[in-house]
């Protein structure tokens, strides 16, 4: 009995505990990042934003949660009921499951696997199924058109993201996210004679063009402005979510924002040194790594929100041209250049 507990039950309980803790922290983080998104957008437009529920409106996201949960879900008469209700669960579950391999600090991940980057890419490519299911099951042309747009957009920019990840893998020599962070503890800043490890060693500097491509592709992959053609209010209203209400709509919304925070976390890990402090000095090393990680995620999300506030929406043909005719050839060329440089210089 003791062997069964130590070998099987205890590891299972630890994994379940880690998962529940991550889920609670992630949902709270998403709630306040959504609040920050609305506040930033309001500030740019000289409005006050959410300011009624709780002090300074800090409880607005939780009030919205209660509102969605207590509402009655309405299913269109001609909809495929099973697929219609399954689609938002698929979207939210896939978005949440990618966080299993995200290390928020040294050794702080639910599942430690040495191909974490490949796992994230694989799960992210499946998220399009939830969108397609929701658009098709609604039995309406507008959700279906929005779903087709979303599928084409996500597939188009996943290619560029894939090539960006290849360059990071070439520089780091690993698919393990923890190893990728460790590799950024020394780099071009140290090579150029900077007295101690710093933010100049992170991948954002040595791979700056790929950093920009990844950031813009992340906006397109998550259907954020200026690439929110899926939810173009003047054309398709809310895209594939037009016929959804109540809890199913909330699950789609949750999946969308969890995916956005995931892209912010990936940007932090791949290019901004993960949980590493900006300067390797004792008074910054004293700050826990998870604090640096969360601050960097919030910094990236701030720019996600600012782009939404001041960049106008692209036309659909411009969106596709940017992905296939600009980002794809440029990222492919960068892969070749990076691989050639590493082979003939010996840097790694």
From Swiss-Prot:
NDH-1 is composed of 14 different subunits. Subunits NuoA, H, J, K, L, M, N constitute the membrane sector of the complex. Keywords: Cell inner membrane, Cell membrane, Membrane, NAD, Quinone, Translocase, Transmembrane, Transmembrane helix, Ubiquinone. It is a multi-pass membrane protein. Belongs to the complex I subunit 1 family. Its main location: membrane. Its EC number is 7.1.1.-. GO terms for molecular function: NADH dehydrogenase activity; oxidoreductase activity, acting on NAD(P)H, quinone or similar compound as acceptor; quinone binding. Pfam families: NADHdh (PF00146). The chain crosses the membrane at residues 7-27, 82-102, 115-135, 161-181, 199-219, 251-271, 287-307, 322-342. The lineage of its organism: Bacteria, Pseudomonadati, Pseudomonadota, Alphaproteobacteria, Hyphomicrobiales. The keyword Cell wall biogenesis/degradation does not apply. GO terms for cellular component: plasma membrane. NDH-1 shuttles electrons from NADH, via FMN and iron-sulfur (Fe-S) centers, to quinones in the respiratory chain. The immediate electron acceptor for the enzyme in this species is believed to be ubiquinone. Couples the redox reaction to proton translocation (for every two electrons transferred, four hydrogen ions are translocated across the cytoplasmic membrane), and thus conserves the redox energy in a proton gradient. This subunit may bind ubiquinone. It is found in: Cell inner membrane. One of its GO terms (biological process) is aerobic respiration. It catalyses: a quinone + NADH + 5 H(+)(in) = a quinol + NAD(+) + 4 H(+)(out). The keyword Cell membrane applies. This is NADH-quinone oxidoreductase subunit H.
